Structure formats: C-alpha cells, structure tokens
C-alpha cells in the first residue's frame, strides 16, 4: 500500500472555481481510469494536468468536493467525472 500525495497550485481562469487542487490517495483501488487522472485536472479537458502528469487518482474515493467515487473520485464540479480522454476531472 503506497501513499500518494500531491499538491498542484494552479492560477488560471480556466480552473473555474479551483485555483489550487490537492490530490491525496492511497494506492489500493487505483485501477481503470483513476491512474489516468492528470494532477492539475484544470481547464475543460484537463489541459493543465497534461503538463504535470502527476496521475494520482485518489484511490480511496477521497476528493475535495465529496463527489462520486466511481473512477477514483477526482473531485470535479459535482463528481460527475466528465471528460473521457483520461481526464476524469470534468469541470
């Protein structure tokens, strides 16, 4: 059981209501699409996360917004897990 911890501080108008996104997970359920989540998870298609490539994916469903846990729980606007190109943070 490895512990992943990452803090991505991003200041960009594209992040909607998030300028700093912290991702914490413990790699127990890191499967399917959770590993593909960009660390930034900002912008419309995870463009900001593309350069960071932290791929942490919140293994236990812990997220910042209390949203869905289906894909590792990258807290989007309401946990809707938008995107579909590996960016599981739909804003």
From Swiss-Prot:
UniProt record, GO biological process: sorocarp development
InterPro entries, per database record: HssA/B-like_chaperone, HssA/B-related
Location of region: Disordered: 1-20, 72-91
One matching Pfam family: Coiled
PANTHER family for the chain: HSSA/B-LIKE PROTEIN 1-RELATED-RELATED, HSSA_B-LIKE PROTEIN 1-RELATED
UniProt similarity note: Belongs to the hssA/B family.
Protein name: HssA/B-like protein 52
Organism: Dictyostelium discoideum
């Amino acid at each position: 059981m490895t512990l992943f911890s990452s803090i991505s501080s991003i200041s960009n108008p594209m992040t909607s209501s998030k300028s700093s996104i912290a991702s914490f997970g413990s790699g127990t359920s890191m499967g399917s699409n959770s590993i593909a989540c960009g660390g930034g998870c900002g912008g419309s298609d995870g463009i900001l996360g593309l350069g960071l490539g932290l791929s942490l994916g919140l293994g236990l469903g812990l997220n910042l917004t209390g949203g869905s846990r289906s894909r590792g729980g990258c807290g989007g606007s309401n946990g809707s897990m938008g995107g579909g190109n590996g960016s599981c943070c739909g804003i």
